[in-house]
Amino acid sequence: MTNYQHELYFAHCHGHPKKPLEIYMFVDPLCPECWSLEPVIKKLKIRYGRFFTLRIIASASLTALNKKRKKHLLAEAWEKIASRSGMSCDGNVWFEQDQPLSSPYMAALAFKAAELQGRKAGMQFLRNMQESLFVSKKNITDENVLLEIAENTSLDLEEFKKDLHSQSAVKALQCDMKIAAEMDVSVNPTLTFFNTQHEDEGLKVPGSYSYDVYEEILFEMLGDEPKPSETPPLECFIEYFRFVASKEIALVYDLSLEEVEKEMKKLAFAKKVAKVEAKHGMFWKSLSTYSDEYQSCEK
């Protein structure tokens, strides 16, 4: 499909000053619960992205994670979240790294450094960080890994290196932390919904829930139940997002995992996707030549 055809389905997801709602999503790049919300966010943006702007706020816990007595508990928690959500996150990463996942601050700072190259760039960098950690078991608190992710995200690498150690990124992260403190956010993920056309306080939703919960809140904030936008053809969806989980496809298209497997096998046979197996669930990588810098359906 051409870039124009992709935009027919995804243009409404991008930011626009006249959208009636803003959603602040507080995330920690190392948080598996945040990762587990990816299918929900994709479906919400595709169906109703014309009504809201999504703003990602870094809300990393600054508690040290490298205490040996905690590793087995963290690993167990990851395994449970993966089993429940269908979004793979391998708890073995806590035992297999030469260096511990010790600095959530560094991962959050890297996200803000990437965001200095544009919000789309930041969104795609965050997604790539999550894939690197939860699927590939890479240490995203290690600077060399972060540089590799930046390169894979097609960022200006020299600019990213400079920004990673700049006061600009630090101030941007401090700004996010201030927002989290002002909104009394203590749980990741947290979504806060604001109606930009009213002065009412926002509606804060700590934790992760099913898609239906967020859709209902969206309707409540809009005061209406609008018709959803057309869902793109599956091949278009894969081309646009490049690397997606079976769980994401299942939720967006209201399919069972068995039905997803059947449909994706057809695309794999046509050499349009490659299957990527993970510890929990399956992922699919687009093999198309379509390239649109920072495909993330953002803003």
From Swiss-Prot:
Gene3D superfamilies: Glutaredoxin, putative protein disulfide isomerase domain. GO terms for molecular function: metal ion binding. The keyword Signal does not apply. Irreversible aggregation upon several stress conditions prevents interaction with Spx and therefore leads to Spx stabilization. Inhibited by interaction with SpxO/YuzO. The keyword Lipid biosynthesis does not apply. It holds the Pfam family Thioredoxin_5. It is found in: Cytoplasm. Signal peptide: none annotated. GO terms for cellular component: cytoplasm. Disruption phenotype: Strains lacking this gene show poor growth, affected sporulation, complete loss of competence development and overproduce Spx under unperturbed growth. Mutants also overproduce TrxA and show reduced sensitivity to disulfide stress. Induction: Expressed throughout cell growth. Negatively influences its own expression. Keywords: Cytoplasm, Metal-binding, Zinc. Transmembrane segments: none annotated. Adapter protein required for efficient degradation of Spx by ClpXP under non-stress conditions. Interaction with Spx stabilizes Spx and exposes the C-terminus of Spx for recognition and proteolysis by ClpXP. Is specific for Spx and does not enhance proteolysis by ClpCP protease. Probably binds 2 zinc ions. The histidine-rich N terminus is essential for interaction with Spx. Belongs to the SpxH family. Interacts with Spx. Interacts with SpxO/YuzO. PANTHER family: CLPXP ADAPTER PROTEIN SPXH, GLUTATHIONE S-TRANSFERASE KAPPA. This is ClpXP adapter protein SpxH. It comes from Bacillus subtilis (strain 168). The gene is spxH.
